[in-house]
Regions:
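Structural signature of transmembrane alpha-helices in multi-pass secondary transporters
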Residues: 30, 62, 66, 93, ...
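Short, Lys/Arg-rich, polar N-terminal cytosolic tail immediately upstream
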Residues: 1-11
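Transmembrane-helix signature of multi-pass solute transporters
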Residues: 92-102, 181-188, 246-250, 323, ...
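12-transmembrane solute porter fold
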Residues: 17-32, 37-41, 48, 52-53, ...
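Hydrophobic transmembrane architecture of multi-pass small-molecule transporters
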Residues: 408-502, 507-516
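Hydrophobic transmembrane-helix bundles of small-molecule transporters
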Residues: 167-280, 287, 313, 483
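Signature of the 12-TM Major Facilitator Superfamily
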Residues: 21, 57, 69, 84-91, ...
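Helix-loop-helix hairpins in multi-pass membrane proteins, especially solute transporters
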Residues: 70-207
């Protein structure tokens, strides 16, 4: 029986290659949807008979469903095995893609996206757990490098692909394109993926799961809608915040009183997992998600590029991530996960503090695109080693570890996106007000006179033109400050990496003294 020995010992080379390919196609397709849909949101409004605020629920629904479903995967794994969980995820994701593409109303689209988000969770968690188990311990860094290629390359590629589809075909094909890929992958996985059911039992605590789900959904809606509704000046935001905090407290109480806990908290006694969990939350969620959110906005709103052009300018970032992710995985196997993590931290912090924080209106768009290469190298060196570090000592807790890492990715990423949105608006308002305060009114009136007398504009149009220029400069300054602020969260996130580096050097000293 295959369950009697580790999965990696049961696979031939051909089986392992197919398993890797099948899992990565599924992961790439699912994670690509997290950013590719962001690009087409404005184009959905008229066909779905809604406004910008209404159509944003298309993104919020997907995110909340995915985050909620994540904690079910470990239970499903013990019931049916990872292969069936992966296949079920493909079925849900592909089927809901068809209904999303055919959506004629906002309610229809939101329902399809909820199912799609649920399917995405089943795909990414089962695929990562199975891929990690399919490789021998000395090659798991490479496996996570391949997985990291999908996790990081897909969202970076989303704006380019989404922009091209929206401009040259139709926005509905963003969903339809998943159907043939999903069907082929579904059939291949059904017939050729090995059955794999880890040897441990798990009983789902439905009470804890309910409270955690309510808390998570409430929190994510607060973070995604807070800026739009005016944060705590809104009764809805206040109510949802209270509901989220209360549900988290009830979840904690349920876990304390129950003998059958939703989460095996002994996982947090494993030092490497705790470090990776912290880094994933702050570096990936709070910081990198800000960068992923801000870059398309920078090229479109400040540089005036079309959606597709903006995607092309982000493409060097995506390609660099894809190129260096397997390299980082190989280094993790041969040396240590700490080496590529230190490289990733240094390059990412340098890029955010000294490159992105200088992106403004006057930075040539093409120059900005090529300046994203160091950032791409840093991100490429990040995903494989941090995942390998998190999972290498978990044993039967691997699926739980994967689930928790993806859960904190969703929650941290929602915080990061909310921070970027809030900071961008706040800094823009501050810059605009400061600009008005120090404005030389005599020169401003002279400029208006030139526009009216020599430019042939009416006084109202001339004033509007001047305000537009001031707003553009304020937005330019806001992008610089928001990018810079994103770096502080990454700085907080890398502190445990420095601790592990210190510990590893400390442990090397006695061994060197013994040899001497």
């Amino acid at each position: 029986m295959m369950e009697e020995k580790p999965l990696h010992e049961s696979l031939s080379t051909a089986q392992r290659v197919f398993l890797t390919f099948s899992l990565m196609v599924g992961v790439f397709m699912a994670i690509l949807d997290t950013t590719i849909v962001d690009i087409i949101v404005p184009k959905m409004m008229a066909p779905l008979s809604t406004d910008l605020y209404g159509v944003q629920w298309v993104i919020t629904a997907y995110m909340t469903a995915a985050a909620t479903a994540i904690m079910l995967v470990e239970w499903l794994e013990t019931k049916v095995g990872l292969k069936k969980v992966f296949i079920a995820g493909l079925f849900l994701f592909t089927t809901s893609s068809f209904f999303a593409g055919n959506a004629q109303s906002l309610e229809w689209m939101i329902t399809a996206r909820v199912v799609q988000g649920f399917g995405e969770s089943l795909i990414v968690v089962s695929a990562e757990a199975m891929l990690f188990s399919a490789y021998a311990p000395e090659k798991r860094g490479l496996a996570m490098g391949i997985y990291g290629l999908g996790v990081s390359f897909a969202p970076a590629l989303g704006p380019t692909l989404g922009g091209w589809i929206a401009e040259h075909i139709d926005w509905r094909w963003v969903f339809y394109i998943n159907i043939p890929i999903g069907i082929l992958n579904f059939l291949g996985a059904m017939f050729f993926l090995p059955d794999y059911k880890p040897k441990h039992t798990f009983r789902l605590n439905f009470v804890s799961f309910f409270f955690l789900s309510v808390a998570t959904v409430s929190l994510l809606i607060v973070l995604s809608k807070g800026q739009q509704l005016g944060w705590f000046s809104s009764e809805l935001i206040g109510y949802l915040t209270f509901l989220s905090i209360g549900s988290f407290l009830l979840f904690a109480l349920s876990e304390l009183l129950s003998k059958n806990r939703l989460i095996d908290y002994s996982i947090f006694r494993i030092k490497e997992f705790v470090v990776a969990f912290w880094v994933y939350c702050f570096v990936l969620g709070f910081s990198m998600y800000q960068v992923f959110y801000l870059l398309p906005l920078y090229f479109e709103r400040l540089k005036g590029l079309t959606t597709f052009q903006a995607g092309l300018h982000i493409l060097p970032l995506a390609l660099t991530i894809g190129l260096f992710s397997p390299v980082a995985g190989a280094i993790s196997d041969k040396k240590s996960s700490l080496i590529p993590l230190v490289i990733a931290s240094a390059l990412y912090l340098y890029s955010v503090f000294f490159i992105l924080s200088d992106f403004n209106y006057y930075t040539p768009a093409l120059k900005s695109a090529f300046l994203l290469v160091p950032l791409g190298i840093g991100m490429g060196f990040f995903f494989a080693p941090i995942t390998n570090l998190a999972l290498k000592n978990l044993g039967t807790k691997t699926t739980l570890g994967v689930s928790l890492m993806h859960y904190i990715r969703f929650v941290g990423g929602s915080f990061g996106t909310a921070l970027a949105t809030n900071d961008l608006q706040k800094f823009m308002a501050e810059s605009y007000d400061r600009m008005v305060e120090i404005q030389n009114y005599q020169r401003a009136w002279s400029f208006l006179e030139i526009l009216t007398e020599w430019g042939g504009l009416t006084e109202e149009k001339a004033k509007y033109y001047l305000q537009s220029i001031q707003s553009l400069y304020a937005l330019s300054d806001s992008f610089e400050r928001t990018f810079f602020n994103a770096g502080y969260w990454a700085l907080l996130g890398v502190i445990p990496i420095l601790y592990l580096l210190y510990q590893s050097k400390k442990s090397l000293k006695p061994s060197m003294n013994e040899r001497a």
